[in-house]
């Protein structure tokens, strides 16, 4: 059996959870929604988002409306493609276990 190759930029549990949320509920979510839903600190979430942004999987957008400012996280086309490839690789890795 060939070695399993999963994208480490996505495979880390917090980043995987972020990507799952964006695919399932996105394509765009508020930073605070992700923070609260995933029970993360602001700094921890920001650190993982920077890694996903550097990979081109997400975009961060700051918006100000009246006195309220918010950061939105949007999955990119590249992020969708990388997530689909990740799921395909994971399915291939698990396929031998289904027999």
What spans do the regions from the language model cover?
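Glycine-centered, phosphate/nucleic-acid-interacting loop/turn motifs that mediate DNA/RNA or nucleotide
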Residues: 56
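Short beta-strand "wing" residues that participate in macromolecule-binding interfaces
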Residues: 60
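Amphipathic alpha-helical dimerization/coiled-coil segments
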Residues: 1-3, 81-99
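Short, hydrophobic-biased segments on the C-terminal half of alpha helices
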Residues: 49-50
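N-terminal helix-turn-helix DNA-binding core of bacterial DNA-binding proteins
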Residues: 5-44, 65-66, 70-74
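Basic, amphipathic "hinge/linker" alpha-helix immediately C-terminal to the N-terminal HTH DNA-binding motif
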Residues: 65-86, 90
């Amino acid at each position: 059996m060939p070695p399993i190759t999963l994208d480490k930029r996505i495979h880390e549990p917090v980043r995987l959870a972020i990507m799952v949320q964006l695919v399932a509920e996105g394509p765009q979510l508020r930073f605070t929604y992700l923070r609260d839903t995933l029970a993360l600190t602001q700094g921890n979430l920001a650190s993982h988002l920077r890694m996903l942004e550097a990979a081109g999987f997400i975009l961060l957008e700051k918006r100000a409306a009246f006195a309220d400012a918010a950061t939105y996280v949007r999955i990119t086309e590249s992020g969708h493609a990388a997530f689909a490839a990740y799921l395909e690789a994971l399915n291939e890795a698990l396929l031998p276990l289904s027999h």
